From Swiss-Prot:
Keyword field contains Cytoplasm: yes
Entry GO CC: cytoplasm
Name of protein: 33 kDa chaperonin
Listed HAMAP family: HslO
Listed Pfam families: HSP33
Main location: cytoplasm
Biological classification of the source: Bacteria, Pseudomonadati, Pseudomonadota, Gammaproteobacteria, Enterobacterales
The organism of origin for this protein: Erwinia tasmaniensis (strain DSM 17950 / CFBP 7177 / CIP 109463 / NCPPB 4357 / Et1/99)
Cysteine disulfide partners in this protein: C230-C232, C263-C266
Function, as annotated: Redox regulated molecular chaperone. Protects both thermally unfolding and oxidatively damaged proteins from irreversible aggregation. Plays an important role in the bacterial defense system toward oxidative stress.
Key word rRNA processing present: no
Length: 292
């Protein structure tokens, strides 16, 4: 795994503000490889990857976050899913031509930002905001302003790094239930906004923080690796087939002689023939008998 694919948490000793810094290269490339995405779509997936990593780092529980853009433009949907272990996957779907250099609004059109938080234990939460900002970072800040009520700023950069294509970002957020000065927070945000793409992508986290906040006392914690990992499996696809009406499954078998289950996230294919389907039904019947 690339040394670059890491998420760092940090705290300001004299301000009730926390920060997160993430840089990704290999993970981003693994998400877009095998897909013929135009450059603007690759870039928005990189930015979504950075945003999802930063948001999952705010989780206080085991679970995952999905950050999705959807609209009526040529980019119908772009989504990244990540969990508290910083395991990421993502995909985009297009419904028209996307020109080189297209902006977020030109790609999505009239659309929404949907953030779904799914704890392993407890209820799922979903927040939806209209895409009113010109950038993904601006749209995410709008989401935080409407839902969390915690002052939050995001800074996302992408471009060519020393080791190839890279993306990175920084999240600043006032700590909850603490008396934080908004002036102090805005001052730290102004400092953070000066980060250059090449600095964020190529320098170690310690050096980035020193360049931004050398007059502040900052505690930098151990990094967490960010990686690509798809949760699909033959077993999971089999469970999906079990939920379908038997006559629908039989019709698919008659038409093609097999059922091909394709994972859009990683490109894996899982093929089931009549023998496989019979085995799935036998297993399902055995499980039902054990339950009763």
């Amino acid at each position: 795994m690339s040394q670059q694919d890491q998420m760092h948490r940090y705290l300001f000793e004299n301000h009730a503000v926390r920060g997160e810094l993430v840089t990704v290269s290999q993970t981003w490339n693994e998400i877009i490889q095998g897909h013929d995405y135009p450059q603007p779509v690759q870039q928005i997936l990189g930015e979504l990857l950075v945003a999802t990593s930063l948001l999952t780092a705010t989780l206080k529980f085991d679970g995952d976050i999905t950050v999705q853009l959807q609209g009526d433009g040529p980019l119908k949907m772009a989504v990244i899913n990540g969990n508290n272990r910083q395991e990421m996957r993502g995909v985009a779907r297009m419904q028209g031509e996307i020109a080189e250099g297209s902006s977020l609004k030109e790609m999505i059109g009239n659309g929404y930002l949907v953030i779904t938080i799914s704890p392993e234990v407890g209820e799922r939460y979903q927040g939806v905001v209209g895409l009113e900002g010109d950038t993904l970072a601006a749209c995410l800040e709008d989401y935080f302003m409407r839902s969390e009520q915690l002052p939050t700023r995001l800074f996302i950069r992408s471009g060519e790094a020393e080791k190839g294509l890279g993306a990175g970002g920084i999240l600043l957020q006032v700590l909850p239930a603490q008396d934080a000065s908004l002036d102090d927070f805005n001052h730290l945000a102004t400092l953070t906004e000066t980060i250059k793409t090449e600095e964020l992508l190529d320098l170690p986290a310690h050096d980035v923080l020193w360049r931004l906040y050398h007059q502040e006392e900052v505690t930098l914690f151990d990094p967490q690796a960010v990686s690509f990992k798809c949760s699909c499996s033959r077993q999971r696809c089999g469970e999906v087939l079990r939920t379908l009406p038997p006559e629908e499954v039989d019709q698919m078998l008659q038409e093609d002689g097999h059922i091909d289950m394709h994972c859009d996230y990683c490109g894996n294919n899982y093929v089931y023939d009549a023998v496989d389907i019979a085995a799935l039904r036998t297993d399902s019947a055995d499980n039902d008998r054990q339950v009763h």
